[in-house]
Regions:
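Charged, amphipathic alpha-helical regulatory modules used
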Residues: 1-106
Length: 106
């Protein structure tokens, strides 16, 4: 299967599986905008990173491991020179962790 088609299918699966939690993570990442993408509206520019994060989020045992996972996803997708330092992702990771705890409690 073509990688782009596979990525779109995976995106739809994750959106369906996580529902409102997916939207919450998307809003959090868009609001914190760690790569300083130029956008006034959340048009899904960070969707590949959100997909990568959510496909592995069950590995996160606590806030620290989620923070490391989030940083790793952005470092992989944008490169060491573009992603900034780990601290840049701390506030977003904290908000995502709180949303994840609410999601797991449902």
């Amino acid at each position: 299967m073509h990688p782009e088609i596979e990525a779109r299918q995976q995106h739809r699966i994750l959106q369906k599986e996580y529902g409102s939690f997916y939207r919450a993570v998307s809003d959090i990442i868009f609001r914190h905008n760690p790569i300083d993408l130029d956008g006034k509206r959340n048009t899904g520019e960070y969707d590949p990173e959100i997909d990568a994060l959510l496909s592995r989020i069950q590995e996160a045992e606590n806030l620290d491991t989620l923070h490391e996972l989030l940083f790793e996803v952005f470092r992989t997708d944008f490169g060491e020179e573009n992603c900034g330092d780990r601290q840049r992702y701390e506030a977003a990771a904290s908000e995502i962790w709180k949303a994840y705890e609410r999601h797991r409690a449902m």
